[in-house]
Amino acid sequence: MFYKIAQKVMFQMDPERAHNLAIGSLKMTGNSPLNAFYAQNIAPAPVSFMGLTFPNPVGLAAGMDKDGESIDAFHAMGFGHVEVGTVTPRPQPGNDLPRLFRLKPAKAIINRMGFNNKGVDNLVKNLIAKKTDIMVGVNIGKNKDTPVEQGKDDYLICMDKVYPYAAYIAVNISSPNTPGLRSLQYGDLLDELLSALKTKQLELAEKHKKYVPIALKIAPDLTTEEIENIAQSLIKNKFDGAIATNTTLTRDGVSGLANANESGGLSGKPLTELSTKVIKQLATGLNGQIPIIGVGGINSAEDALAKFDAGATMVQIYSGFIYQGPKLIKEIVEAYRLK
């Protein structure tokens, strides 16, 4: 009930202003009695993933809490993990406003945020400051002004700094809103990046005496052959996990709606079938050797179950969470427990 009232107010506001207000409010209330307005008890449904044990298989996707400011509040809601970021080595403002658009009839969102964040050093401070022991993945990317050919260096900088504080690290090469970024998903550029990250991971594991898994987040706008090539590269470089998928550049299911022609990545219900299809193809290519987090268009427990059936071990929500509220977490966990 509280979420429906809050949502009604928020949906009257500019989307980015509403987002910033929500994150600020959650930051202030995460460890206070006021978190009773959104906290919920969810019975454990433990799941093993990348050598880690999560309390349940439902996580918050990257992009909601870019700077890790409201981690404790999301823990109170019952998420099994939170993925913060995308974070870059240096702070950057992102793309020009407006850059976030609701397509309410389709339960969808278009964004062209452009990795706006306060930088990796600020994120590390927030990771240290969190009060709860929730599993936190850190999604890392490159700065907009770093040439793609040197992008590897940005990922290594971020990895080095977040490694001691992350449950796992997600490598984002699939956002459509950073020029040239998606080119890292192909051929020699991909192999070179994954190899460098794996080498760095093993160095950091020795240095910090703990092994932090790394996962690759991929786009939905890939051919079957491209997905197979990515799968082979992940296996070859001994990556620990994959996350499928990011937002799509297609506009299937939103034609004619207000804001449908805005540039950027489309998320939400129109992405449901495409992301599930990619998960299934990726799972085939990985052949059980590397586990997958399924994300994209999960608007109900049934959508999540389809991701599990396609080959995902865990799922993440974002747009569906905005449209449905925290109850979606509980619904998915309960359905998972019964499946």
UniProtKB/Swiss-Prot annotation:
Write out the pathway annotation from the protein's UniProt entry. Answer: Pyrimidine metabolism; UMP biosynthesis via de novo pathway; orotate from (S)-dihydroorotate (quinone route): step 1/1
Q: Give the cofactor binding note.
A: Binds 1 FMN per subunit.
Q: Name one GO biological process term.
A: 'de novo' pyrimidine nucleobase biosynthetic process
List, from the UniProt record, the residues annotated as the active site of this protein. Answer: 175
Q: Give any GO molecular function from the UniProt entry.
A: dihydroorotate dehydrogenase (quinone) activity
Alphabetized PROSITE patterns for the sequence: DHODEHASE_1, DHODEHASE_2
EC numbers on record: 1.3.5.2
What does this protein need as cofactor? Answer: FMN
Protein location: Cell membrane
Q: One Pfam annotation, family name?
A: DHO_dh
* GO terms under cellular component: cytoplasm; plasma membrane
- The yes or no answer to whether the keyword Protease is present is no
Q: What does this protein do?
A: Catalyzes the conversion of dihydroorotate to orotate with quinone as electron acceptor.
**Alphabetical list of NCBIfam families matching this protein:** PRK05286.1-1, PRK05286.1-2, PRK05286.1-4, PRK05286.2-5, pyrD_sub2
Entry's family note: Belongs to the dihydroorotate dehydrogenase family. Type 2 subfamily.
**How does the annotation summarize its subunit structure?**
Monomer.
Query: Which protein are we looking at?
Result: Dihydroorotate dehydrogenase (quinone)
Source organism (scientific name): Shewanella sp. (strain ANA-3)
